[in-house]
């Protein structure tokens, strides 16, 4: 079962999900509604947080490893966690991603992007475009002999390149795109 908790407490910006199969979502309208465009803010946040729950259930370690350790051993970068939630539930929007992303690319500071949603979404789009949508699923569902997801190993197996090389290829692609405009 998945538990969804709606709250009016102002301690939560939008919402968050945890590996224990629950999500907490703030129902009061906030500044984040400005970047959702025509999409209803609550629908956007709910879809995003539910995607996190799908992710957590996909990457869990073997049944014999107790919580929370079975959720912490895979080494998945935060940009994947947030990026695929954005990729599967949202659209690239000017106020949500484009302006910040363009700013960092043009100033050669993509390595300083603080929010893993921004570069994560961009990297997820690039990953899917270059290797296909199904590669994301293959990477996250791959298990080694011990029945663990080793993200770096799985990434290389299903893309043919290392994460480091992927990040460099992505950076070059972003430079080519933004500097050619």
Predicted feature residues:
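Beta/coil-rich, acidic/histidine-enriched accessory regions frequently appended to metallopeptidases
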Residues: 141-181
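Soluble non-cytosolic domains of exported or imported proteins
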Residues: 36-45, 75-79, 114-118, 130, ...
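Post-HExxH zinc-binding segment in Zn-dependent metallohydrolases
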Residues: 58, 66-110, 157-170
